[in-house]
């Protein structure tokens, strides 16, 4: 079994107007040290910013780590924890209600990063 670094990540994203200007932030904690990251876009959605917070935080990690992510986004948390996103991908990004999933490029990147860790 690998002896991986344990990293805890807290994320958040927000948007004014939805769509509208928005931003994201994350705090990564490893061995008592903290690193903050943030960013934003002029025209985005709340869900995109929630996803970007997780993606950008995971991109900071340059090696495989034992990662625990905390997010207040039901969209992100439920899609990952309930494995919906994997079903959407398997079904050519069609959800159970027969509609096309949104933010496909971001979901693909998030899946790639999760599979690395």
Regions found by a protein language model. Name each.
Residues 2-52, 57-65:
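RNase H-like nuclease fold core
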Residues 14-21, 55-117:
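RNase H catalytic domain
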